[in-house]
């Protein structure tokens, strides 16, 4: 699951431009490439970096740098993926924290272990997936999560986390709250049930399957994977061509009474009933209705095809993107009385 431990080389005054999908040219006071859990642990006791704040970076797809990072950036490059066990009901697969998420999903399908196909093409690494509890098209990562191992960056101890300890929420977990900045996730194990049925509740997925001449009831996991990839490529910009961090805002969830009042004013509002009686709203619809889709503030803009995505047109800073985000939040709150929450971590 990783290369053997070796001495960790430190990289002073390190550019993070290639390590965040917005392409911001922030710099780290010092950085280190990490290829094993032992290397994470060794830096907990390394006098060269004693007292420095620490930041673990995988793909950098969920971070907005508003300034240089005056500390130690740990670049997670722990690789490896394997079937670690199976029983009558499921396969258990493990992947290193530095593995590319999309490549991992594609590998599980190639190995005949479906279940994660709705999460195809989400940017980032396997280690970042539990932090955000990534989700898309009717599936959240937590539904197939078994356990993870993480290094305590203060002590160097290797710690095991089950789902309860991770405290997953909507695009949220222990690692975004009490555990923020304290742990480096080095490996994640997923449980993929052998009794598989397609998740095709989202209209976009059903439409894409139909356009491909596929009966949704007979869809294979690879069909769903291909449909999701096509949808995401049509709607979302490639970060290599146009800097972005994917969905910038969470879809807000409000109580039924507030929704009834809102729908009386906005009868065509896009919404999704939740099991607990609350209602999830489509943040992109709210932003679009406020007239922000396709608009720019300087070199930061709202994408023309997906209002949830903020983009760097070239030369924007993290502060520029945050200024745009705050303007959008202000307008949505003023018109709908709904407060949008940002998904990325802002530093």
From Swiss-Prot:
Main subcellular localisation: cytoplasm
Catalytic activity, EC: 1.3.1.98
Pathway(s) it belongs to: Cell wall biogenesis; peptidoglycan biosynthesis
Gene Ontology annotations for the cellular component aspect, listed alphabetically: cytosol
Any Pfam family the entry gives: FAD_binding_4
MF terms in GO: FAD binding; UDP-N-acetylmuramate dehydrogenase activity
Function per UniProt: Cell wall formation.
Name listed for the protein in its UniProt record: UDP-N-acetylenolpyruvoylglucosamine reductase
Organism expressing this protein natively: Burkholderia mallei (strain ATCC 23344)
Classification lineage: Bacteria, Pseudomonadati, Pseudomonadota, Betaproteobacteria, Burkholderiales
